[in-house]
């Protein structure tokens, strides 16, 4: 790939103009089906049915083998579309499959995940699901997961969470209560935000993705506020705002301590809590840690692929301390990045920007630019070949709020030779 096939930030007008350099439209790193399957274990009484080709079913089973501690505990079934289904439709047989799942599992609800082929042949999966739900007298939701229209597994997680709104029902609002819409593996009761909410007597109705039941999801509209800590929860938050008038706050993994402090102040206002001076002190501590980072990164150039923090905010903070981004890959577009894009445009950096299509771009750009360090994942062979400092954040326990920022900054200090 020639560097001219990528676009500089200065030539991009709006966030949504960021495009993929691949000739394949929106070719993502992982199928959105991957993202859907990652979330299947979190709802105890809702099995999943994948509707697609044999390959989709095989792909799903292989993912479960990799990510599950106990693969047999994943309630995932597959319906493989055959030639007759393409010609005559699969509605009747799909209904039989759902009946069998109901008989076997006695579930509270079922989720149907449809992949590319049903969409391409015009199969009305939503209609089949609606009719099956009526006949079986069982809540059945539908989540499309077609890779030709979605960029990555992140989109799959987002779409599945949004589909959960189909299970919800109007509830009496509970004052001083929240739902936590977070990233996978972040619903820990010991997370920074959770600890603070509990200490202040705030009731947490649902943490998702987190262990819960269909009943928990159904009653989620009883919360007075949704706290969105990860982009995958944003579609669901918007649906709940539209359907149940539940407000939401974005509390992303910011790199700027002032933004994290602002999030806490916003929560205090919405929940009518007294301001906690502890967060002011934490912001000062993390700002001091950034000052130390500045000595490690000043005058250095880097390529940014991904990190646990919000990408644009991370780049803006590194720029403040003298580091220059040569290229920046967007993994999956989201409102956390979108809200910071105007500030990004008016900054003093002008990296190449692209929607990430494949990791081969990294190798070619490393050969061209020879940066001082790389933020994201690289193969071990490429790291040895280029002798580049690679900040992949493997093994770093990432929480939320200031805890997440501290973990990332301490990792950077160690990786680039500083002292924490």
Residue ranges and their predicted role:
Residues 1-420:
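An N-terminal assembly and electron-transfer interface module characteristic of large anaerobic redox
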């Amino acid at each position: 790939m020639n560097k001219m096939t990528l676009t500089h930030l200065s030539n991009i007008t709006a966030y949504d103009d960021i495009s993929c350099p691949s000739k394949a439209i929106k070719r993502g790193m992982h199928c959105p089906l991957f993202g859907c399957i990652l979330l299947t274990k979190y709802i105890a009484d809702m099995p999943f049915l994948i509707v697609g080709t044999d390959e989709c079913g095989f792909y799903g089973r292989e993912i479960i083998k990799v990510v599950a501690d106990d693969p047999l505990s994943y309630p995932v079934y597959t319906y493989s579309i055959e030639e007759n289904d393409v010609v005559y439709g699969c509605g009747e047989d799909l209904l039989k499959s759902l009946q069998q799942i109901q008989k076997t599992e006695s579930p509270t609800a079922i989720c149907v995940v449809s992949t590319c082929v049903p969409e391409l042949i015009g199969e009305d999966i939503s209609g089949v699901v609606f009719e099956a739900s009526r006949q079986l007298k069982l809540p059945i939701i539908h989540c499309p997961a077609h890779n030709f229209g979605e960029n990555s597994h992140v989109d799959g997680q987002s779409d599945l969470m949004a589909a959960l709104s189909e299970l919800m029902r109007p509830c009496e609002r509970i004052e001083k209560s929240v739902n936590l819409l977070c990233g996978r593996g972040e619903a820990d009761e010991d997370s920074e935000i959770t600890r603070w909410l509990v200490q202040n007597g705030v009731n947490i109705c649902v943490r998702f993705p987190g262990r819960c039941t269909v009943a928990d999801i159904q009653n989620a509209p009883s919360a007075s506020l949704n706290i969105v800590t990860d982009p995958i929860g944003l579609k669901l938050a918007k649906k709940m705002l539209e359907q149940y008038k539940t407000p939401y706050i974005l509390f992303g993994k910011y790199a700027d301590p002032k933004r994290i402090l602002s999030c806490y102040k916003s929560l205090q206002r919405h929940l009518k809590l007294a301001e906690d001076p502890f967060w002011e002190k934490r912001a000062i501590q993390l700002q001091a840690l950034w000052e130390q980072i500045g000595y490690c990164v000043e005058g250095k150039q880097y390529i940014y692929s991904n990190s646990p923090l919000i990408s644009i905010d991370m780049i803006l903070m590194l720029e403040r301390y003298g580091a220059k981004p040569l290229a920046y890959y967007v993994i999956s577009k989201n409102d956390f990045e979108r809200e910071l894009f105007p500030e990004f445009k008016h900054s003093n950096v002008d990296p190449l920007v692209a929607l990430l299509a494949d990791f081969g771009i990294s190798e070619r750009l490393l050969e061209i630019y020879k940066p001082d360090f790389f933020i994201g994942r690289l193969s071990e062979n490429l790291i040895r070949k280029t002798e580049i400092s690679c900040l992949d954040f493997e093994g770093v326990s990432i929480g939320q709020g200031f805890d997440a920022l501290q973990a990332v900054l301490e990792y950077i200090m160690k990786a680039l030779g500083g002292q924490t």
